[in-house]
Regions:
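Metal-dependent phosphoester-hydrolase catalytic domains
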Residues: 1-175, 294, 333, 344-416
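Structured beta-strand-rich core segments of catalytic domains in phosphoester-bond hydrolases
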Residues: 121-123, 170-182, 202, 221, ...
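Active-site beta-strand/loop signature of hydrolases that rely on acidic residues for catalysis
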Residues: 188-195, 206-236, 254, 267, ...
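Active-site environment of divalent metal-dependent phosphoester hydrolases
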Residues: 199-200, 229-233, 259-261, 312-314, ...
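C-terminal luminal/periplasmic domains and tails of membrane-associated envelope-modifying transferases
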Residues: 286, 315, 415-416
Length: 416
């Protein structure tokens, strides 16, 4: 009924404001569902509101907040109206039908989610899900007013929604708009890390372990890949918000998926003064992007670009095409750090092209044991422009993901 991550990304809201919008939508939807239940066309307003709201929210325009309110309220109204019907929970036969309906619905949901995520958040499958939801509400819509024993659920849900809205409003008023930041020193530590949305090598989910791995290197800048802002398949948590708050670092978001909930991110203790996003035009499986930020340091500014190139072993041509787009996106800005999972080993044409463009591989002097992926390859890189001095590079021996983080200590050119 409401995804705080989607509300933050599509409408540009902070978490408390996102929770406020969704809470008001839920409360309004429950009230609307109670009023419409029993009318033969009562499903129509909820259908129109949810459909129009999804369209507005998906566009991410200035109408996104209104879209979130409408979609949440419309969906909640349809659910409330159906659940208030006399056909729900009346006798053993009715219970069996409801249980079967829920079971089939869950199976259908899993199938749709699988297709949705393999298409990297395609709106097509969201539309299919909306059609199925509204069709089900139309078929199951109650034909008469709910009985008196059904009504108490209405004020309870309404009060709960209002309380959520009030709590979110209070949090919005008392929380700072941004975390504190200061110019970085002339010597900094940079990390690149594919966090697999917080899942460790043994598939155990723990963002706390992810945070501890990052803390072990005490980095000034962290470039992250496979960051989820609320995908259900990745536990529904907003990885970026949680890690930013937990580590006390500024966050920049670079979505790759169409819905804006999965992609790359950059955390920094410095002040971010510019941010740019590039979406690659070619991809073989999941959509990919690159994120660039300009971070202020004591004697100048540093550009940091994070990316995650295509994964399949047979996608070499696609990765080369993505590298050409990446180099055009970089456009020679210096000094620069380009970091991320490139899905190419040293000596691959992808790495050769980046070195040919003048970049330096900070891990070039590492031994063959310095692998970064679970299958024993070095495919995660920290590349720098030649005016940056590489003081140290290492791979942390920690498996809080299916990748190990790469860390480098760098001296900025103005420190010479």
């Amino acid at each position: 009924l409401g995804n705080p991550g989607l509300a933050q990304v599509q409408a540009g809201l902070r978490l408390p404001a996102a929770a406020l919008v969704l809470g008001l939508g839920l409360a309004g939807g429950m009230a609307l569902g109670r009023l419409l239940a029993g009318h033969w066309a009562g499903w129509l307003p909820g259908t129109v509101a949810s459909g129009l709201g999804l369209w507005l929210a998906w566009r991410g325009s200035s109408w996104a907040v209104a879209g979130l309110l409408l979609s949440t309220a419309g969906t909640a109204a349809l659910l409330a109206g159906v659940l208030l019907g006399d056909h729900v929970g009346r006798g053993r036969g009715s219970i069996d039908r409801v249980a079967l309906g829920f079971a089939l619905g869950l199976v259908l949901q899993v199938g749709l989610l699988f297709r949705y995520y393999t298409a990297t958040g395609s709106g097509l499958y969201l539309g299919v899900a909306w059609l199925i939801m509204t069709l089900g509400a139309t078929v199951w819509w109650p034909s008469r007013e709910p009985g008196i024993d059904r009504v108490p659920v209405y004020p309870t849900a309404l009060v709960a929604g209002v309380l959520v809205a009030l709590a979110a409003s209070w949090q919005e008023l008392r929380s700072p708009a941004t975390l504190s930041a200061a110019p970085l020193p002339d010597q900094i530590t940079v990390m690149t890390y594919n966090i697999q949305s917080g899942f460790a090598l043994d598939n155990r989910w723990s963002l706390e372990e992810t945070a501890r791995t990052i803390e072990a290197a005490q980095p000034d800048i962290v470039v992250l890949q496979e960051v989820s802002r609320g995908w259900l398949v990745t536990n529904g948590a907003d990885n970026l918000l949680w890690l930013s708050r937990r580590l006390g670092m500024q966050a920049a978001w670079g979505p790759a998926s169409t819905d804006g909930l999965w992609g790359n991110a950059i955390l920094t203790r410095g002040s971010v003064t510019a941010q740019e996003l590039w979406r690659f035009s070619q991809a073989q499986n999941l959509r990919r992007s690159a994120l660039a930020v300009r971070v202020e340091a004591g004697g100048g500014s540093l550009w940091v670009i994070g990316t995650h190139l295509d994964d399949p072993r047979g996608a070499g041509a696609v990765r080369l095409a993505q590298v050409e787009e990446l180099l055009a996106f970089w456009a020679g800005r210096a000094p620069v750090v380009i970091a991320g999972e490139l899905n190419a080993e040293p000596g691959d044409a992808v790495i050769a092209r980046l070195l040919e463009a003048g970049l330096v591989d900070t891990g070039a002097r590492l031994g063959p044991e310095a692998t970064t992926s679970e299958d024993g390859r070095r495919i995660d890189y920290l590349l720098v422009s030649p005016e940056i001095t590489v003081l140290e590079a290492r791979v942390l021996d920690r498996w809080s993901s299916d990748h190990r983080p790469v860390v480098a200590t760098l001296r900025m050119p103005w420190a010479e």
